[in-house]
Amino acid sequence: VGYSEDSFTPSEFELTEYLKDGENKLAAQVFKWTASSWCEDQDFYRFSGIYRDVYLFTVPDVHVYDLRIRAIPDETLKKAELEIVTSTWGKGKMKLTLSGKGEILLQEERSLNGEDTCTWEIQDPLLWSAEEPNLYDLELEISDESGKLQEIIPEKVGFRRFEMKDGIMTLNGKRIVFKGVNRHEFSSVTGRHVSREELLKDIVTMKQNNINTCHYPDASPIYRLCDEYGIYMIAENNLESHGTWDIAEFTGDHTDIVPHNKPEWLGMMLDRVNSMYQRDKNHPAILIWSCGNESFGGKDI
């Protein structure tokens, strides 16, 4: 059916044409070493196998397969633009509701025609930050052209303005001081498989100890928890190749560094960055996008 080598972002496979009536067998084979092993040299305990969720799902005839949310206040912080971009299979209708603090801020219906962009102006939005992680509830109710309900998509929206001013990083007009940690996804009991309860414990512990930043290509639930609890994130591409870097530093020969300037590695780099961005692009907690960690440099990065 398919093959994938990025071990930190989801791999999605279309099964429809392979299914038959009655019982079907679904098999997955995990390889310990592949070409991607050169790019996944992060410092952690190494285990083989599948350690994140595996699930089957179906989609309706009218389906939003991609959703992009931009919620950015202007410089006054008194009003913000909410932009919703949808990519849809089939034509239909969308009823959008934005609510928060028990109040409906926005409710509107729009038609869906494949690729659609909708924008609204929001007055006096409650801003998102580590100190006050205000989130709004966004709900998209998708129907076909006859009005029959197809799917409901819930999301969280955080309004925040992150920018550089005179060489200083600011959020909502105020200087940010990052107090971060290189957090690894690991359990002393279950290894690389970490339950939501353990993820929540990590986040609460970080907040209680004045840690406001972390980086890593984590499992999806951690990003939602960082949105909710107010943890700034550096979303990091699944790239670390310091093993080849160490060899080069020892020998003085940089020709074996990966990915460096090698065109044969560029496709993998772009695929990994795109997978990270597409999965996590709507999280207000993500302030910085990282091309990777400890990978020397070069044209590919």
Name each model feature, range by range.
Residues V1-M233, R272, L287-I288:
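Secreted/periplasmic carbohydrate-active enzymes, especially glycoside hydrolases
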Residues M206, N212-I301:
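Substrate-binding/catalytic cleft of secreted carbohydrate-active enzymes
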